[in-house]
Amino acid sequence: MIELDAINPNNLKILEVINEKCFDPEIIIFPTSFYKDTISVGPLAQYAYFNQVCVGAVRCKKETHNKSHKIQILSLAVLPAYRNRSIGTKLLEYACETAAEGKAKEIYIKLSPKLDVSEWFIHRGFIIDESSKTEDSVLLSKKL
């Protein structure tokens, strides 16, 4: 059974552990400020629990441009042993629902092509923004 729960000051360190286990430090390094700012984003950061074990997390941030809101996914990670159990999908659905409830018009993520996860997002309704594609990053977005 998959359950989601808030990230709070008492369990914040778990986010760091999940990210360290899921992301190659040569590709992605999260600065200390990323973790410090996590508590302030409220519902835009959640843990995923599988049978009461914390196995994943999503962390987003809200952006406002010309009175229009967008949500950027900064981290979406599931521990390798728990992948292919719809946990990542549940975290992504939660992020999209929370973004829509907050009146965001779009949700997006910038990825390193080295991560090789673009197809996962495309299968969940995201599209590649070809105009922002570089050799170091690809932007995928979904209208809400």
Curated annotation (Swiss-Prot):
The keyword Cytoplasm applies. This is Uncharacterized N-acetyltransferase C663.13c. It comes from Schizosaccharomyces pombe (strain 972 / ATCC 24843) (Fission yeast). It comes from the Eukaryota. Gene3D superfamilies: 3.40.630.30. Residues 2-144 form the N-acetyltransferase domain. InterPro entries: Acyl_CoA_acyltransferase, GNAT_dom, N-term/lysine_N-AcTrnsfr. Transmembrane segments: none annotated. Keywords: Acyltransferase, Cytoplasm, Nucleus, Transferase. GO terms for molecular function: protein-N-terminal amino-acid acetyltransferase activity. Belongs to the acetyltransferase family. Its main location: cytoplasm.
